[in-house]
A protein has these predicted regions:
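Cytosolic regulatory protein-protein interaction regions
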Residues: 1-166
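Intrinsically disordered, low-complexity regulatory regions with latent secondary structure
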Residues: 159-213
Length: 213
């Protein structure tokens, strides 16, 4: 699927193909880990999970943007950096939630650094009409990280989700805001406690990104 559609104008909601592939791998891991697995197989999953995380963190947005028009390359690089930070946070949080990745200080520090970078990048991207529609999922991921006591980050996520709803006239950002606020007040911190059922946090069914390329 990725090889067939990855270079098309509707390319996975603006996701760099390698990062989108890693999201698919993470979701497959989550499905496998929900089954009763022998300890040795669980250890293998942990090793593979670290490989995925290392690959995400080694992704180069600058190289990805090189194939784009020079006039839009800076925006593509910004989008790639946002996706990279959000996917790294998703990888850690969602795999810790099912005990594939451990709850250790090193990964907590990684989440802190990725979230700080993601917040800085979102401040730059959300005002840009060409990137705005791609920002809902990264904001949701940042909101999950904000459960760890960062009230200023929670306020930022609330504000920007409300802005997205006003900019677009869509309800999805407000739905995300409600979900996150319930999570922040729940006393829980794991990824799966945030989402009691599946949600599709996208702004539109398919965004034509051909005018950015």
């Amino acid at each position: 699927m990725i090889e067939h559609y990855g270079n098309g104008p509707f390319a996975f909601q603006g996701f760099p193909t390698p990062l989108f592939a890693d999201i698919i791998r993470i979701n497959c891991f989550r499905q496998r880990a929900t089954k009763s697995l022998p300890i040795i197989e669980t250890e293998d999953l942990t090793y593979e999970a670290y490989e995925i995380l290392n690959r995400i963190q080694s992704f180069s947005s600058e190289q990805w943007a090189e194939s784009k028009l020079p006039s839009r390359r800076e925006e593509w690089t910004l989008l790639g950096n946002i996706r990279q930070a959000a996917v790294a946070l998703y990888c850690i949080h969602s795999l810790q939630s099912i005990s594939v990745l451990p709850l250790i200080p090193f990964l907590r520090e990684s989440c802190f650094l990725h979230s700080q970078q993601l917040q800085r990048l979102l401040k730059r991207a959300i005002p840009l009409p060409s990137l705005r529609l791609f920002m809902l999922w990264p904001l949701v991921v940042l909101g999950v990280e904000a459960v760890n006591g960062d009230l200023s980050m929670q306020a930022f996520v609330q504000e920007k989700l409300s802005e997205l709803s006003r900019y677009t006239g869509m309800l999805a950002p407000l739905t995300a805001k409600d979900v996150l606020e319930r999570f922040w007040n729940s006393g829980r911190t794991d990824w799966d406690s945030c989402f009691e059922r599946p949600y599709a946090f996208i702004m539109v069914p398919a965004v034509d990104v051909s005018k950015l390329s």
